[in-house]
């Protein structure tokens, strides 16, 4: 297994990860055009990490870098995390989260965080099984 941060030249791996997200999250979103995905991968405030098994994308996550006015250190908002069903419960997700946390620490981030809906029992159980520092219960409002 290998974990890597995608570059703008690795759009095909990003597309494969989006397919995994579609499967895992059971949504039928259209995959955006290649130019859009390449632009995202070129944006220093957006990152994609993938877990590879046998050279193929088995899962991954996306990160939005948040710059804050009260600290010179950014935060990493881990947005989507998905592992292909055939690779779940084999340590890939935990290894991915651990590698991302190491990356963030080595690159001067204040912290990294991820949200899970309270009723998403599997996601909450997964995150509680990782090496997190703090759990916050919050109410999320969408506009």
For the regions a language model picked out, list residue spans one by one:
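Conserved active-site alpha-helix within GNAT-family acetyltransferase domains
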Residues: 94, 118-137, 143
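A short beta-loop-alpha structural element at the N-terminal edge
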Residues: 1-16
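Helix-loop element at the rim of GNAT/NAT acetyltransferase active sites that forms part
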Residues: 16-29, 69
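Conserved beta-strand in the GNAT
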Residues: 50, 56-65, 77, 82
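Conserved GNAT acetyl-CoA-binding A-motif
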Residues: 97, 104-116
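Active-site rim helix/loop that mediates acceptor-substrate recognition in acyltransferases
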Residues: 27-48
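A conserved beta-turn-beta hairpin within the catalytic core of GNAT-like acetyltransferases
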Residues: 67-78, 88, 134-136
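Conserved acetyl-CoA pyrophosphate-binding loop and the N-cap/start of the following alpha-helix
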Residues: 87, 91-99
């Amino acid at each position: 297994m290998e974990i890597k941060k995608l570059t703008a030249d690795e759009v095909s791996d990003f597309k494969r990860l989006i397919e995994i997200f579609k499967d895992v999250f059971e949504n039928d979103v259209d995959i955006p055009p290649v130019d859009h995905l390449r632009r995202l991968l070129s944006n220093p405030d957006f990152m994609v990490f993938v877990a590879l098994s046998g050279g193929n994308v088995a899962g991954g996550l996306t990160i939005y870098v948040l710059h804050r006015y009260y600290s010179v250190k950014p935060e990493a908002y881990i947005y989507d995390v998905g592992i292909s069903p055939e690779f779940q419960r084999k340590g890939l997700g935990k290894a991915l989260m651990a590698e991302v946390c190491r990356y963030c620490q080595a690159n001067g981030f204040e912290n990294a965080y991820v949200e899970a809906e309270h009723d998403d029992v599997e996601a909450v159980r997964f995150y509680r099984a990782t090496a997190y520092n703090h759990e916050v219960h919050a109410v999320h409002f969408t506009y």
